[in-house]
A protein has these predicted regions:
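Extracytoplasmic thiol/disulfide redox context detector
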Residues: 1-97, 171-174, 210-214
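C-terminal cap of thioredoxin/glutaredoxin-like
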Residues: 1-27, 78, 145-214
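Generic structural signal for secondary-structure transition and capping sites
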Residues: 29-30, 117, 130, 166
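Short clusters of hydrophobic/aromatic residues that line enzyme substrate/ligand-binding pockets
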Residues: 47-50, 132, 195
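Extracellular/periplasmic catalytic domains that process cell-envelope and extracellular macromolecules
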Residues: 51-52, 81-82, 115, 180-183
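A structure-centric signal for secondary-structure junctions around beta-strands
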Residues: 55, 105, 184-185
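Structural alpha/beta surface segment adjacent to cysteine/selenocysteine redox centers
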Residues: 59-148, 214
């Protein structure tokens, strides 16, 4: 084999390897807009309101034991009260492992959701967060008390809290969050785009207004 032929074949082999690498990179990981939108809001995601025109969707990844989420909570509630069904508001779980009762709280909320009481438990957990938050011991009994106050079937609630189905549901939200680049809470998405402003009433309102007026 001549030297020129060897060089030509070598160049061709390198080109083919590069092309194969590009194809593999493009195939690895589905980052199409449709896939991103699906990861932001799933069919079973918890909606606190649903817009009549589906124009504006706000998604919050939260941890019930997160102090920043608690600080944002009044702004979120004010925003929801102001816009009502003009926006779709979605809550997704993103419990932080360093918070001792974040998973317990998320499981309690999901167990309540299975009896149609997600929003009531969501509000209860934030309204009382200074009572149960950042306690080193389990607050499961406290959450059971909230479930009783909400009139839930306690046998079913306790079974759901301990179930793999509820644990998997919470983990699924967290996995979506990680795939979307969520690193802390609260993290908001507006129409699939990560919100980069201040997570207060003024910042969220400006982003929502921009979406509604677009």
């Amino acid at each position: 084999m001549s030297t020129n032929l060897k060089v030509t074949l070598g160049v061709l082999a390198i080109a083919l390897a590069v092309l194969a690498g590009v194809v593999l990179v493009n195939r690895g990981g589905d980052s199409t807009p449709a896939a991103v939108a699906e990861a932001v809001v799933r069919p079973d995601s918890h909606r606190l309101s649903t817009a009549v025109d589906s124009k504006t969707t706000v998604v919050e990844f939260l941890d019930f034991e997160c102090e920043s989420c608690l600080a944002a909570y009044p702004s979120v509630e004010k925003l929801r009260a102001e816009y009502g069904d003009r926006i779709t508001y979605v809550v997704r779980y993103f419990p932080i492992a360093s918070h001792p009762n974040s998973y317990n709280a998320a499981h309690a909320a999901e167990a309540a959701a299975r009896q149609g009481k997600f929003e009531a438990m969501y509000k209860k957990l934030f309204d009382t967060a200074t009572v149960w938050g950042h306690q080193q011991q389990s607050q499961a009994a406290v959450f059971e008390g909230y479930a009783q106050e909400l009139g839930l079937d306690m046998t079913r609630f306790k079974a759901d809290v301990a179930s793999t189905q509820v644990a998997d549901r919470v983990k699924a939200d967290a996995s979506d969050g990680e795939a979307l680049g969520v690193q802390g809470t609260p993290t908001f998405f507006i129409n699939g785009e990560k919100f980069a402003g201040r997570p207060d009433y003024a910042g969220l309102k400006a982003a929502v207004d921009a979406s509604l007026n677009s």
